[in-house]
């Protein structure tokens, strides 16, 4: 049997009618032992993993963004800290501000701190 190049195979495939293509597919499944249900199940697995969305986040202050005073005030108000504790926390950036908080709370904290020009990450 002569070896076909990819271009020759594609050209031959273009010339086939639907019935011939279906026979080719069935022959390939039989020849190589391909189980179509296994292929579908394997393809669906990554989609299921991607659907799982993270529900808790750690809020980390990366830097004060050059607006230290506003960030200290925001941290003080949002975390219920004293002024000195908030100042020490901001000055020790990067630092974890809150751990395992719900998505809504994490996004709210990020929005308010970003408004004060802080650099925040959620992970």
From Swiss-Prot:
GO terms for biological process, alphabetical: translation
Keywords from the named record: Ribonucleoprotein, Ribosomal protein
Pfam families: Ribosomal_L12, Ribosomal_L12_N
GO MF annotation, one: structural constituent of ribosome
Domain of life assignment: Bacteria
A single Gene Ontology CC term: cytosolic large ribosomal subunit
Protein name stated in the entry: Large ribosomal subunit protein bL12
